[in-house]
Amino acid sequence: MQLNDLRSAPGARREKLRPGRGIGSGLGKTGGRGHKGQTSRSGGKIAPGFEGGQQPLHRRLPKFGFVSLKAMDRAEVRTSELAKVEGDVVTVQSLKDANVINQNVQRVKVMLSGEVGRAVTLKGIAATKGARAAIEAAGGKFEE
């Protein structure tokens, strides 16, 4: 037996259905679309979410929530990410330059997560109590 002799077992593959090609096919005449009506016509699709004129579900349910604009210009930074900044002074701009935060961020807060590798000075950056203690324990300081 060669690779070019391989064949599927009889009955393993079904033939493609050809609607509208005679009554013997099982899909003759109406071709499985039923009689009359919108969906029997060519191009007769119903829009997604349309419920036959009844008020659709997405309009019956109330709206809720909103997107806070404050979230767009604020960011949280882990203490372990401070090592990615070159130099001893960490500012918002230096975090942007090191690709730690997004370019549209204006306010940053440091969270305690990971180790503080070296002494750094943070200018204009807030920190949680735990992060502040860890940075100061490593010899770092804060400036406004």
UniProtKB/Swiss-Prot annotation:
Keywords: Ribonucleoprotein, Ribosomal protein, RNA-binding, rRNA-binding. Residues 21-31 have a biased composition (Gly residues). The keyword Cell membrane does not apply. InterPro entries: Ribosomal_uL15, Ribosomal_uL15/eL18, Ribosomal_uL15/eL18_sf, Ribosomal_uL15_bac-type, Ribosomal_uL15_CS. SUPFAM superfamilies: Ribosomal proteins L15p and L18e. The keyword Transferase does not apply. One of its GO terms (biological process) is translation. Pfam families: Ribosomal_L27A. Residues 1-57 are annotated as: Disordered. One of its GO terms (molecular function) is structural constituent of ribosome. One of its GO terms (cellular component) is cytosolic large ribosomal subunit. Belongs to the universal ribosomal protein uL15 family. Part of the 50S ribosomal subunit. Binds to the 23S rRNA. This is Large ribosomal subunit protein uL15. It comes from Stutzerimonas stutzeri (strain A1501). The lineage of its organism: Bacteria, Pseudomonadati, Pseudomonadota, Gammaproteobacteria, Pseudomonadales.
